[in-house]
Amino acid sequence: MLIMNLQLFAHKKGVGSSKNGRDSESKRLGVKSADGQFVLAGNILVRQRGTKIHPGENVGKGKDDTLFAKVDGVVKFERLGRDKKRASVYPVDVEAIAE
């Protein structure tokens, strides 16, 4: 009786899947209107997670903590003590800007 001891090897390389290669889309957070910039009512000033910058004069806060201008005016970023910041919009005369 003939006994054959065969060892079969893979003829195609097994390719494992990588555990990398995924990432979430960036949320485009940050300051959208600079200090001293003229903005219109409704313009977004800051997109943020949590209140890193607090709303000040004529600035509203959306449910996702976005700060937006309530009136036409000039943006001013101010400090509240040592650790807090505030964004305000101060109205200006349109005639004064045009001149």
Swiss-Prot record:
InterPro entries: Ribosomal_bL27 (IPR001684), Ribosomal_bL27_CS (IPR018261). Keywords: Ribonucleoprotein, Ribosomal protein. It comes from the Bacteria. Transmembrane segments: none annotated. GO terms for molecular function: structural constituent of ribosome. GO terms for cellular component: cytosolic large ribosomal subunit. The keyword Transferase does not apply. This is Large ribosomal subunit protein bL27. The gene is rpmA.
